[in-house]
UniProtKB/Swiss-Prot annotation:
GO terms for molecular function: ribosomal large subunit binding. One of its GO terms (cellular component) is cytosol. Pfam families: RRF (PF01765). Gene3D superfamilies: 3.30.1360.40, Ribosome-recycling factor. This is Ribosome-recycling factor. The gene is frr. InterPro entries: Ribosome_recyc_fac, Ribosome_recyc_fac_dom, RRF_sf. Keywords: Cytoplasm, Protein biosynthesis. One of its GO terms (biological process) is cytoplasmic translational termination. The lineage of its organism: Bacteria, Pseudomonadati, Thermodesulfobacteriota, Desulfovibrionia, Desulfovibrionales. Belongs to the RRF family. CDD domains: RRF. It is found in: Cytoplasm.
Length: 186
């Protein structure tokens, strides 16, 4: 590996850490309805844990309602049961044709808890970014030990890795601030 490929690899891995943060944030419930709310709910469909999105069409008719329309009539009760068993605090209403879920407004206490969870996810992303930095710096030091690059090149590349790290840590903080604002919005 040369310096450029180490930097590229580090940047890719840092991007993945932020992508993971985005996915975690999508699962966090805000006051608004979102199809991603039910992404992680698995339905026991013919003995196989199956995501709701593979059994039904999920849509958001308005900001406080989710509708789920299972393609198989026999799956209605299964989907309804899976939603009630999830820890999201959602109450599905099954009218035989469609399952409606009204998203209740979040309490102040629940909002504060969600902000804490968002901060925890952000911290985990920052740790992942810093781990990538450590790996990149270790790889650069190995190149220096093997006399493949000079000490000056290592110093310059280490500075580049640090700038990359600072940029991704700042991005994760921005994402966290935006998510906190979204959660606290009434």
């Amino acid at each position: 590996m040369d310096m450029d490929s180490i930097l590229l690899d580090a940047e890719e891995r840092m991007e993945k850490a932020l992508g993971s943060l985005d996915r975690e944030f999508a699962k966090l419930r805000t006051g608004r309805a979102s199809t991603s709310l039910v992404d992680n709910i698995k339905v026991d469909y013919y003995g196989t844990p199956t995501p709701i999105s593979q059994l039904a069409s999920v849509s958001v008719p308005d900001s406080r309602t989710l509708t789920i329309q299972p393609w198989d009539r026999s799956a209605f009760q299964l989907v309804e049961k899976a939603i009630m068993k999830s820890d999201l605090g959602l109450n599905p209403v099954n009218d035989g044709k469609i399952i409606r879920i009204s998203i209740p407004p979040l309490t102040e206490e629940r909002r504060k808890d969600l902000v804490k969870v968002a901060r925890k996810y952000t911290e985990e992303a920052k740790v992942a970014v810093r781990n990538v930095r450590r790996d990149a710096n270790d790889a650069l030091k190995k190149l220096e030990k093997g006399k493949e690059i000079s000490e000056d090149d290592v110093r310059k590349s280490t500075d580049d890795v640090q700038k990359l790290t600072d940029r991704f840590v700042a991005k994760s903080d921005e994402k966290c601030t935006a998510k906190e604002k979204e959660i606290m919005e009434l």
